[in-house]
Amino acid sequence: MATSPPGVLASVAVCEESPGSSWKAGAFERAYVAFDPSLLALNEALCAELLTASHVIGVPPVGTLDEDVAADVVTAPSRARGGAGDGGGSGGRGGPRNPPPDPCGEGLLDTGPFSAAAIDTFALDRPCLVCRTIELYKQTYRLSPQWVADYAFLCAKCLGAPHCAASIFVAAFEFVYVMDRHFLRTKKATLVGSFARFALTINDIHRHFFLHCCFRTDGGVPGRHAQKQPKPSPSPGAAKVQYSNYSFLAQSATRALIGTLASGGEEGAGSAAGSGTQPSLTTALMNWKDCARLLDCTEGRRGGGDSCCTRAAARNGEFETVAGDREPEESPDTWAYADLVLLLLAGTPAVWESGPQLRAAAEARRATVRQSWEAHRGARTRDVAPRFAQFTEPDAQPDLDLGPLMATVLKHGRGRGRTGGECLLCNLLLVRAYWLALRRLRASVVRYSENNTSLFDCIVPVVDQLEADPETQPGDGGRFVSLLRAAGPEAIFKHMFCDPMCAITEMEVDPWVLFGHPPATHPDELLLHKAKLACGNEFEGRVCIALRALIYTFKTYQVFVPKPTALATFVREAGALLRRHSISLLSLEHTLCTYV
């Protein structure tokens, strides 16, 4: 028991009549299918708990700032209050969205302390609390083969899913579901309530299942173990050291971006990377190419050959062909993830067009978070993780205006060029019908005009055509078109033609893994599929980690713009890496300086 992480021991020793009783009757009777939208309906209280856990927690500012200090320090987050559709401030294509609020203004919350606590999760030498929780269950209860099969299914789906807010939320929900499925009835142990008490956080889920991928077995280069003559490692464990260097880069970038929630205003977006970030991050960013080179599937291939991305693109084409021949009848549960995306992103910089549905979703989220925060107040007071103790104070509360930023990949609230750090369209890739629809939408935009009409100018007419012809839409009650309208043409343009993060995410998403497994209606085949995943223990990504190193460097430079010489060097090196992987994008300079 001495190895249990702070706060988790209590969370696995509660009785079934308390938090675990929020599961609906029969919730664990069905066969487990990872990333099944219908699972979200089995525990509304857990959904509310995770939605609350996705928010930054604010506390009243300590004292009143002196005038001299207030002139230099801004404790309020940079995200403009009031939602994405307000249209206030200088929301031009290249400028800040709104001026930062007065840190001493009445009613504002100080998000600095929570940002500092959240940053600590992404320290390279901090243990993974998801791994520690699993180890604690293993020591206390033992892990059955059935649990291993279900957990392996969840891990495989996370490797094939887009890195986005919806995926992180679903992974958090289903991790709790898998643990409670196997230990609630027999051991009276539940993880429901652990996020409310900060025993686990949404950042722990992000780090374990997506950022570091603690279960990944390919060392960051897909197919490495399948090579007939793998390159000899210079020393035992060299592959893990190389992967850890990438993890340091990614986690350092994430820490810096979280820090913008407390660093004050928009000045970080215009400051040089050398002055606006920690020296360790600056060094890591400058050395991103060396980090990527060791994890690049194209490194050392003088004769060319297929890259991870060309193989992924070919497999995507195969899936589209097969899926187009026999598209299944979508069940109403399919669109639960579309509604989840709307709930998570309404009123954030990911959505720039306002409307009744968006305002209703944002208000529903705020009401749910308020209620859940109050419902767990007593549990937080009795048992909270020590580093989050100050957030049990009566005046501490979620920052509802910022929204669920902790569930997003980049965890900052910046907006520029009518785009935000979280891409709405990347979230839609989690739905089979939308994965197909987005591919068809891009093809329609490209071939819309035979003349030299710009790609950007083709987007709105194509969306108009899609809206006018229900036969070409997914049978989702108009959700897809509504979400495209909410994102706006700039976000669509950025996703399809400009942003390396979006382009690489489309390569990472594996439709065969997400949608090509046996359904729950074929229990024997499904059980065999999960058993193969568990016994094979081959959890490989779809693209090499070199591209992820590029993503985190690029996204950090969008917020902390480097000096011109460093920027030019990065653009040249990043462009070369993308070309080696057959990824064609519009000007990286344009994307760096115009969007975020």
Swiss-Prot record:
Q: Where is the composition biased (Gly residues)?
A: 82-95
Q: Where does Zn(2+) 1 bind?
A: C128, C131, H208, C214
UniProt KW keywords: Host cytoplasm, Host nucleus, Metal-binding, Zinc, Zinc-finger
Q: Where is the signal peptide?
A: none
Residue span of region Zinc finger 2 = 423-502
* Annotated positions binding Zn(2+) 3: C308, C309, C544, H581
Q: Where is this region: Zinc finger 3?
A: 308-581
Q: Name one GO cellular component term.
A: host cell nucleus
InterPro entries to which the protein is assigned, alphabetical: Herpes_env (IPR002597)
- Spans annotated as Disordered: 76-106
Compartments in which it is found: Host cytoplasm; Host nucleus
What is the first-listed, main subcellular location in coarse terms?
host cell
* Source organism, top-level taxon: Viruses
Q: Where is this region: Zinc finger 1?
A: 128-214
Q: Family membership, please give it.
A: Belongs to the herpesviridae UL32 protein family.
What job does the chain carry out? Plays a role in efficient localization of neo-synthesized capsids to nuclear replication compartments, thereby controlling cleavage and packaging of virus genomic DNA.
What name does this protein carry? Answer: Packaging protein UL32
Q: What organism, scientifically named, is this protein from?
A: Human herpesvirus 1 (strain 17) (HHV-1)
